[in-house]
């Protein structure tokens, strides 16, 4: 039975009120409120070798780490998978300099990124006592899925790295604490928040170096893998690249995506899908229950039609539809 105009209007009003309520909630909380009672934080010194920092990330199953400059006693940026991908691209384009890779330190990344003409290490940060809404805005502005929380010692005035806040943790915090998410009943296809145009995809036979270029050029964290008929079958993530580097594959990136996935770790979290008819209430419930980083949007038979990222969801909650 088709919904009446009155019922559609009621759903629309309820959704708008729910979004406004969630915004007020985000303004009333600070980043401290989101942090667990106890947690572990790994901070890397900028003098550390890049290959050693890679092992630290992989051994601890993390995708980023704050950097600390011990010479200046200051926060020096956030190391992410993007930085390692930049290293791969640099040595792939400059094979004559490949012998230097084992000597590369983290503070040398800026030279590589400058040579490539790509963004430098992300140095955006926020004080943990600022409103959560403000932290969300800063993440959207820097086009990053995470932001370091930097405090200051009251006596010495030295910076203190408190933690790294992620979009996933914020949205899960909202899903756990805001019952208003149950009123987000408008289908996501009607909200204009799905990325559909110019979305890159690959196939199992696509060379990994081509996918790496898609990741950097599109500034995305994953590329969906489809078959010859457009059906979604898997995803290649930026994190998967780290496993290749650990295996020493810096300059032999002609191997296919299918071959690369054979090296994927067993703790892969899987591919999450939805349709245009799904509602944000359902999406938020999934975020509450599982560690989700994106939803690939498929049609009724499983063909890929778009992607809904955590950034898309956060942007809608903060700023409304596009």
Swiss-Prot record:
InterPro entries: AMPK_gamma/SDS23_families (IPR050511), CBS_dom (IPR000644), CBS_dom_sf (IPR046342)
Impact noted for substituting residue 145 to E: Reduces glucose inhibition of SNF1 and leads to resistance to 2-deoxyglucose
Main localisation: nucleus
Keyword rRNA processing found: no
Keyword annotations of the record: ATP-binding, Carbohydrate metabolism, CBS domain, Cytoplasm, Nucleotide-binding, Nucleus, Repeat, Transcription, Transcription regulation
GO MF annotation terms: AMP binding; ATP binding; identical protein binding; protein kinase binding; protein kinase regulator activity; protein serine/threonine kinase activator activity
Gene disruption phenotype: Leads to a decrease in the length of G1 with respect to the wild-type strain along with a smaller difference in the cell cycle length of parent and daughter cells.
Pfam families noted in UniProt: CBS
Impact reported for residue 242 to E: Decreases SNF1-activation efficiency
One example of a Gene Ontology biological process annotation: filamentous growth
Binding annotation for ADP 2: 195, 221-222, 309-312
Subcellular location: Nucleus; Cytoplasm
Outcome recorded upon mutating residue 146 to A/Q: Reduces glucose inhibition of SNF1 and leads to resistance to 2-deoxyglucose
Reported impact of residue 166 to N: Reduces glucose inhibition of SNF1 and leads to resistance to 2-deoxyglucose
SUPFAM superfamilies per the UniProt record, alphabetical: CBS-domain pair
GO (cellular component) term, any one: plasma membrane
Disulfide-linked positions: none
Similarity field: Belongs to the 5'-AMP-activated protein kinase gamma subunit family.
Domain notes: The 4 CBS domains mediate binding to nucleotides. Of the 4 potential nucleotide-binding sites, 2 are occupied, designated as sites 2 and 3 based on the CBS modules that provide the acidic residue for coordination with the 2'- and 3'-hydroxyl groups of the ribose of AMP. Site 3 can bind either AMP, ADP or ATP (AMP, ADP or ATP 2). Site 2 binds specifically ADP (ADP 1) and is likely to be responsible for protection of a conserved threonine in the activation loop of the alpha catalytic subunit through conformational changes induced by binding of ADP.
Note: Present with 11700 molecules/cell in log phase SD medium.
Protein task: Adenine nucleotides-binding subunit gamma of AMP-activated protein kinase (AMPK), an energy sensor protein kinase that plays a key role in regulating cellular energy metabolism. In response to reduction of intracellular ATP levels, AMPK activates energy-producing pathways and inhibits energy-consuming processes: inhibits protein, carbohydrate and lipid biosynthesis, as well as cell growth and proliferation. AMPK acts via direct phosphorylation of metabolic enzymes, and by longer-term effects via phosphorylation of transcription regulators.
Assembly information from the UniProt record: AMPK is a heterotrimer of an alpha catalytic subunit (SNF1), a beta (SIP1, SIP2 or GAL83) and a gamma non-catalytic subunits (SNF4). Note=Interaction between SNF1 and SNF4 is inhibited by high levels of glucose.
Listed name of the protein: 5'-AMP-activated protein kinase subunit gamma
């Amino acid at each position: 039975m088709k919904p009446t105009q009155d019922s559609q209007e009621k759903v629309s009003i309820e959704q708008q009120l729910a979004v406004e309520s969630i915004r007020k909630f985000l303004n009333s909380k600070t980043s401290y409120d989101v942090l667990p009672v106890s947690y572990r934080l790994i901070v890397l010194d900028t003098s550390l070798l890049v290959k050693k920092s890679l092992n630290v990330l992989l051994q601890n199953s993390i995708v980023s780490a704050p950097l600390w400059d011990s010479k200046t006693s200051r926060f020096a940026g956030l190391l992410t998978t993007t930085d390692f991908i930049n290293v791969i691209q640099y040595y792939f384009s400059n094979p004559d300099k490949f012998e230097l890779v084992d000597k590369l330190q983290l503070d040398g990344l800026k030279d590589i990124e400058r040579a490539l003409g790509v963004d430098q290490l992300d140095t955006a940060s926020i004080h943990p006592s600022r409103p959560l809404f403000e932290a969300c805005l800063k993440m959207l502005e820097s086009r990053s899925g995470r932001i370091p929380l930097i405090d200051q010692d009251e006596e010495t005035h030295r910076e203190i790295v408190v933690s790294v806040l992620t979009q996933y943790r914020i949205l899960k915090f909202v899903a756990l604490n805001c019952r208003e998410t149950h009123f987000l009943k408008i289908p996501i296809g009607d909200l204009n928040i799905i990325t559909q145009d110019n979305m890159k995809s690959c196939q199992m036979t696509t060379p990994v170096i081509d996918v790496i270029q898609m990741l950097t050029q599109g500034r995305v964290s994953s590329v969906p893998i489809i078959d010859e008929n457009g059906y979604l079958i898997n995803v290649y993530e930026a994190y998967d690249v780290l496993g290749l580097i650990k295996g020493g594959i810096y300059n032999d990136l002609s191997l296919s995506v299918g071959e690369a996935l054979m090296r994927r770790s067993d703790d892969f979290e899987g591919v999450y899908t939805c349709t245009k008819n799904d509602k944000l209430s359902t999406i938020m419930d999934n975020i509450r229950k599982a560690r989700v980083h994106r939803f690939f949007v498929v049609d009724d038979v499983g063909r890929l039609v778009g992607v809904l990222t955590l950034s898309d969801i956060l942007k809608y909650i903060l700023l409304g539809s596009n």
